[in-house]
Structure formats: structure tokens, C-alpha cells
Amino acid sequence: MFENYDKENMFESIWNFPNNLKDAIVLGNGIDLKNDYSHINNIVIAGMGGSAIGGDIVSVLENSNIKIPYTVCRDYSIPGWVNSSSLVICSSYSGNTEETISAFHKSIERGASICGITTGGTLLKLLKENKKDFIKIPSGLQPRAAVAFSFIPLIKLIEKIGLIKSELDLWIEKSIDVLEKKRIIYSKEGNENPVYQLAQKIYKKIP
């Protein structure tokens, strides 16, 4: 029934979220850094939309583990204090987000260290041309459905650099187990589905 309304197939994206978490862990564990980051004393995540949300999730999950200033920047510019001791991580699913590309160029001007997370596009080209470390994530998803690939590789990257010691793997393992069980319950049609029951209760009502 829901197929008539789910034109962008978000059901499949949500169903696959536990699988994406597993794939993102594998991807993050395989990071191979070429550059030196031993001098870094602050981190900026430059991104928009789902990519910026990934940065927000990291801030919440690792708040007590990150021992240096950490901020998410949703803008064409970057904070005025960014300098050669800063790490700017440019995150754009498409690789063509204007604000993120602009932040990349401004980070170059400031002499900041730069890493990137993207599927390709202009950002990947710039990262390669400037010999910056990057994580290439899977394409073919809607950006808002690619959250697993916007926050897990980000945590793994910061951990690989040595700026945090995360317990992400244990947390994700438990989360995957819960999600795999819940997706079966929440994918049923009709009154067996608690989400369907809730929808019926609030239908034509203002919460």
C-alpha cells in the first residue's frame, strides 16, 4: 500500500540503515592517512544538510571524548580563528555543495589541514589535486538517507588521527541489533504496526 505514496523509496533506505551502519564501520576502519595531523588543536566540520547532521551526531556521541574545540560550520565561510593548527573536514555527499567547496578554498587560504568525506564531484577532485586525505563513501543514496556514511567515517577519521578514543564499534553493534529487530515490527502493514496505530490516532488532528 505505502508504495503508492513512497515515490522516493524511503522505505528501502530506512530498511537498509542497519546494513549501512555495518558498511560504514568497515569503510571507516579502512582509512589510510597520508598526511600528518600531530599539530591539530581544533576541528571544523564544513558541510550542509545530512553531511552537517553527521557532524552534529559526532558532537553529541563523542562530546566527552573530544578534548579539543570542535564545531560544525554550515556556511560559505569558516570561523575567523581557523589557522594552520586547525583541521577542516569538508563533508559533502554529492561533492558539489557550493558552501562546502567555498569552505575548502578558504581553508586552503588559511593554511589549515583539510580532509574530506564525499562520493565524488568537485570536492573529490580538489582533495586529490591538493593531496588531501579523503574518505570516498558509496553513491546512489539520497543524501538524507546517507547519515550512516556521514557520521561513522567522520568519527573513525578523527579517531585515526588520534584526537579521540571512541567506543563507537560497541555502540553501533548494539544499535544494529535493535534496529534489525525493530525494522521487522515497523514494516508490517495494518494494526500490527505500532507506527500505523500512532498514525491513525493523530490523523486529522493537530499534535
Map each language-model feature to its residues.
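The first (N-terminal) embedded transmembrane alpha-helix
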Residues: 13-20
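Glycine-rich phosphate-binding loops that contact phosphosugars or nucleotide phosphates
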Residues: 37-184
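Short gly/ser/thr-rich secondary-structure transition/capping motifs
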Residues: 23-30, 68-74, 189-192
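Short, non-transmembrane cytosolic segments of multipass membrane proteins
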Residues: 1-5
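Active-site phosphate/pyrophosphate-binding segments
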Residues: 6-9, 13, 28, 32, ...
